[in-house]
UniProtKB/Swiss-Prot annotation:
Gene Ontology molecular function: deoxynucleoside triphosphate hydrolase activity; dGTP binding; dGTPase activity; GTP binding; nucleic acid binding; RNA binding; single-stranded DNA binding; triphosphoric monoester hydrolase activity
The name this protein goes by in its record: Deoxynucleoside triphosphate triphosphohydrolase SAMHD1
Organism for this UniProt entry: Bos taurus
Amino acids binding GTP: K104, V105, D125, Q130, R133, R440, K444, K512
Active site as annotated: H221
């Protein structure tokens, strides 16, 4: 049994950056640290909550903040600016407006009760952001997983919230980083707005439809997000609101856009050159929170792992809250990067494994993918006959709406129903495809294979249907003539997020003995059970015709094509075992 004295003996301080690490400054003191979540009733706030609130509202006056702490002012004084030492009429009005616009609380099924700054709420309450309510997060996956009815709207809220969590964790843990309230707000806005540029059915639009409808351009939803963000700010007059809350639009709008798209293109490939303009090199770590171009560990993934798994009914094995507790900024090659404890390396491999599993089980589900393909076919046939009104009354099609953000604001998943219920004879072909989806009369899966040696290059994808159609076995009599237009060849690249590279090679870790020194951990130091390769390619073939004769011909062509190209043994769609053996035996002679 412990004595009373031993029970009162303070525990040995931890040196790993965890919450029990002794505070380095008054800001980090456990008794005085401002909470992440302020109670909506400001009258209950203590001095530190008032201090945090004033900072969030853009009051950067050091004397005011110092006085607030020294006199231990409570929230009950906020309606009386003079008692806080605020004499300027403009600042009085700003404070009173801030009180009216205190943090809004939203009940999210993934993260619980989450708070948003008034400026974030002004962004959320715009037509450009509300549009995300009508874009399915997983596109055609909803037709396979009935629970996957969630949209880009709630995912964006989650990413904005987590971005704030991570940057505040770093700020409170390492005050020497000098993370300002401006920085925090900008990171949250970038998280909130990172998916504004998604089109109907999310990745189907920029991954399948636009490359076929407009092959001459390279357009991504990240580019669309930046364009839509600019449109959102300008059309809703939010520059003045940003200034009101302490931002500098000339600098901060650029910083927000850079977090979404990455640095500008440079003809000189020099890793040591700082290409960003929104924030200096000393704050390089801020660019690793929303969309981490360095190693892919970012809050975007954390939210969609948790949210997608919740709606798909799949177990999520990655806990972002643990990463938050061990995240620290260390210097690596004269740059500041977000690092984690060396003991967390196994959990990070689990994170990337979770991503790979989600792609295998859900994102690249063969039925979900073919539904995306059918919707793409329908949109291509409807493209010239759909008109969307944009700025100055100009008309745009589905594929050209990306050139005008006023038109793009009106383009959501609802275009599916517009085509489906249209009586326009020009939309007959597109309408028939969508009716097939509704009645589950889908293109038929023929088979799946993998290249054994060399992966198929993207520029060769369009030639694959012709290759399969031409691969007619000479020793098999077929009753149907197969044409290239009857086939869909879907090439899927599965990886850990960095093509064939190991993403952990781009992560740095710190040890308990030295919190400031970043180290690299090689794959062999972790486990012998980790993957040897980090990327593979799957090739799936589908047939648009559903009669037995054409499907039999398609299987024969597919098997012969695999043999010609020395691909892996083809996996054929469910056939009776005897019939499958007979087909393979016939094809191989």
């Amino acid at each position: 049994m412990q004595s009373a004295d031993s029970q009162n003996t303070p525990k040995r301080p931890r040196r790993d950056g965890s919450p029990r690490t002794p505070p380095d400054s008054p800001l980090a003191d456990a008794e005085t640290s401002p909470s992440h979540d302020l109670d909506p009733d400001y009258r209950t706030w203590g001095p530190e909550q008032v201090w945090s609130f004033l900072r969030r509202c853009g009051f950067s006056d050091s004397e005011l903040l110092k006085r607030c702490r020294e006199k231990r002012m409570s929230g009950s004084l906020l309606p009386f600016p003079e008692d806080l030492g605020i004499s300027s009429h403009g600042k009085k009005m700003k404070l009173l407006n801030c009180i009216q616009d205190t943090m809004k609380v939203i009940n999210d099924p993934i993260h619980g009760h989450i708070e948003f700054h008034p400026l974030l709420m002004r962004i959320i309450d715009t037509p450009q952001f509300q549009r995300l309510r009508y874009i399915k997060q997983l596109g055609g996956g909803y037709y396979v997983f009935p629970g996957a009815s969630h949209n880009r709207f709630e995912h964006s809220l989650g990413v904005g919230y987590l971005a704030g969590r991570l940057v505040r964790e770093l700020s409170e843990k390492q005050p020497e980083l000098q993370i300002s309230e401006r920085d925090i707000l900008c990171v949250q806005i970038a998280g909130l707005c990172h998916d504004l540029g998604h089109g109907p059915f999310s990745h189907m639009f920029d991954g399948r439809f636009i490359p076929l409808a407009r092959p001459e351009i390279k357009w991504t939803h990240e580019q669309g997000s930046v364009m839509m963000f600019e449109h959102l700010i300008n059309s809703n007059g939010l520059q003045d609101v940003m200034k009101y809350y302490g931002l500098i639009p000339e600098e901060d709008i650029l910083f927000i856009k850079e977090q979404i798209t990455g640095p500008p293109e440079s003809p000189i490939k020099d890793a040591s050159k700082w290409l960003y303009k929104g924030r200096p090199k000393e704050k390089s770590f801020l660019y690793e929170i929303v969309a981490n171009k360095r190693n892919g560990i970012d809050v975007d993934k954390w939210d969609y792992f948790a949210r997608d798994c919740h709606h798909l009914g799949i177990q999520n094995s990655f806990d972002y809250k643990r990463f938050l507790k061990f995240a620290r900024v260390c210097e690596v090659d004269n740059m500041k990067h977000i690092c984690t404890r060396e003991k967390e390396v196994g959990n990070l491999y689990d994170m990337f494994h979770t991503r790979n599993c989600l792609h295998r089980r859900a994102y690249q589900h063969k039925v979900g993918n073919i539904i995306d393909t059918m919707i793409t076919d329908a949109f291509l046939k409807a493209d010239d006959h759909i008109e969307i009104t944009g700025s100055a009354g100009r008309k745009y099609h589905i594929s050209t709406a990306i050139d005008d953000m006023e038109a793009f604001t009106k383009l959501t998943d609802n275009i599916f129903l517009e085509i489906l219920y249209s009586t326009d004879p020009n939309l007959n072909d597109a309408r028939m495809i969508l009716k097939k989806i509704e009645s589950r009369n889908l293109y038929k899966f023929v088979g799946e294979t993998q290249p054994m040696i060399q992966r198929i290059k993207k520029e060769n994808y369009e030639h694959l249907p012709n290759e399969v159609a031409s691969a007619k076995p000479s020793d098999v009599e077929l009753e149907a003539e197969l044409k290239a237009e009857d086939l869909i060849v879907d090439v899927i690249n599965m990886d850990y997020g960095m093509e064939d590279k190991n993403p952990i090679d781009h992560v740095r870790f710190y040890c308990k003995s030295d919190l400031s020194k970043a180290v690299m951990i090689t794959r062999n130091q972790v486990s012998q059970f980790l993957p040897e390769t980090f990327a593979e390619q799957l090739i799936r073939v589908y047939c648009k015709k559903t009669d037995e004769k054409t499907l039999f011909a398609a299987r024969q062509h597919f098997v012969h094509w695999c043999l010609i190209n020395d691909f892996t043994k083809p996996q054929i769609k469910k056939l009776p075992l005897r019939k499958l053996k007979k087909e393979l035996t016939t094809a191989t002679g």
